[in-house]
UniProtKB/Swiss-Prot annotation:
The gene is NDRG3. Residues 364-375 have a biased composition (Basic and acidic residues). It comes from the Eukaryota. The modification N-acetylmethionine is found at M1. Residues 347-359 have a biased composition (Polar residues). This is Protein NDRG3. The modification Phosphothreonine is found at T322, T329, T332, T355. It holds the Pfam family Ndr.
């Protein structure tokens, strides 16, 4: 873990700040598109070219962020190039959240979370994309989950960071209304992303995102997106009953990797989501020494996890995976069939010495337990 911590500390600042200390969420070799849908215009950024019949990696950011501030530290991380050389990446910005977005006209009705999900099929059609592997954070994770529930044929896999499957309760709603009277939207967003420990322990990171939220995101548009997220419906997903046909259950059908930092405000929500998903195709990754933005603070660990996830789906089998293999520990595991992710198997390869190691003794393996990994 000490070695990983050293990597983390040297990675953050170059990714987030330039030599003058200003924010640096730069895009590289990208094409931008504004695509009209029945629910309004959506801004999309394409990185790379689609590779044959392979799915495209499609990302969706959280409230207070856009694709640059949410994902570029991750996708610009050196080890991610091993993945991006095999996949095109499609970054979706929620309406009005992209850099330089103008304010919506007075009376504009911002799309609901369900409508934001329904803006994605026209995007795929416009770009001639057949399927996706989605990576979503917070609100973006909810949107991609809704999209996968409505269009399972278009989604091969999901990486859901800080996902909350529940509607906002009336107590939470009332609290947010009251806090809105005394707290500005920037502080509300920061409390959504970061726990108290991280707010106090990582002032440079917090200041970077405070300035980004306050200065780079249109504040009127941000309030509309925040209101839409606060008005979300429950995803109404449910864990399949043992022996029951999975088609009768409303749950995610694709391979799913849930990710949360152990200091994130979203821990309880992610654990709740995990309890509702099919354990056969779900992995829960808890990241130690990490808060609300694991893709920014621990890009190395998340990259390694994503490589395993893709390998389990049959992609990039030759990818080198060493960092996570040295550090991972397993709290519970599933006994799954062939062709599935090493994250979801009881036996995994030790890449450093070529041997295999059993994560749990056979008497505690249970096909109906979700695989949990901490690193």
């Amino acid at each position: 873990m000490d070695e990983l911590q050293d990597v983390q500390l040297t990675e953050i600042k170059p990714l987030l700040n330039d030599k003058n200390g200003t924010r640096n969420f730069q895009d590289f070799d990208c094409q931008e598109h504004d695509i009209e849908t029945t629910h309004g215009m959506v801004h999309v950024t394409i990185r790379g070219l689609p590779k044959g019949n392979r799915p495209v990696i499609l990302t969706y950011h959280d409230i207070g962020l856009n694709h640059k501030s949410c994902f570029n530290a991750f996708f610009n991380f050196e080890d991610m190039q091993e993945i991006t050389q095999h996949f095109a990446v499609c970054h979706v910005d929620a309406p009005g959240q992209q850099e330089g977005a103008p304010s919506f006209p007075t009376g504009y009705q911002y799309p609901t979370m369900d409508e934001l999900a329904e803006m994605l099929p026209p995007v795929l059609t416009h770009l001639s994309l057949k399927s996706i592997i989605g990576i979503g954070v917070g609100a973006g994770a909810y949107i991609l989950s809704r999209f996968a529930l409505n269009h399972p044929e278009l989604v091969e896999g999901l990486v859901l960071i800080n996902v909350d499957p529940c509607a906002k309760g009336w107590i939470d709603w009332a609290a947010s209304k009251l806090s809105g009277l005394t707290t500005n939207v920037v502080d509300i967003i920061l409390a959504h992303h970061f726990g108290q420990e991280e707010l106090q322990a990582n002032p440079d990171l917090i200041q970077t995102y405070r300035m980004h939220i306050a200065q780079d995101i249109n504040q009127d548009n941000l309030q509309l997106f925040l209101n839409s997220y606060n008005g979300r419906r429950d995803l109404e997903i449910e864990r399949p009953i043992l022996g029951q046909n999975d088609n009768k259950s409303k749950t995610l059908k694709c391979s799913t990797l849930l990710v949360v930092g152990d200091n994130s405000p979203a821990v309880e929500a992610v654990v709740e989501c995990n309890s509702r998903l099919n354990p056969i195709n779900t992995t829960l990754l808890k990241m130690a020494d990490c808060g609300g933005l694991p893709q920014v603070v621990q890009p190395g660990k998340l990259t390694e996890a994503f490589k395993y996830f893709l390998q389990g789906m049959g992609y990039i089998p030759s990818a080198s995976m060493t960092r996570l293999a040295r550090s991972r520990t397993h709290s519970t595991s599933s006994s799954l069939g062939s062709g599935e992710s090493p994250f979801s198997r009881s036996v995994t390869s030790n890449q450093s010495d070529g041997t295999q190691e059993s994560c749990e003794s056979p008497d505690v393996l249970d096909r109906h337990q979700t695989m949990e990994v901490s690193c």
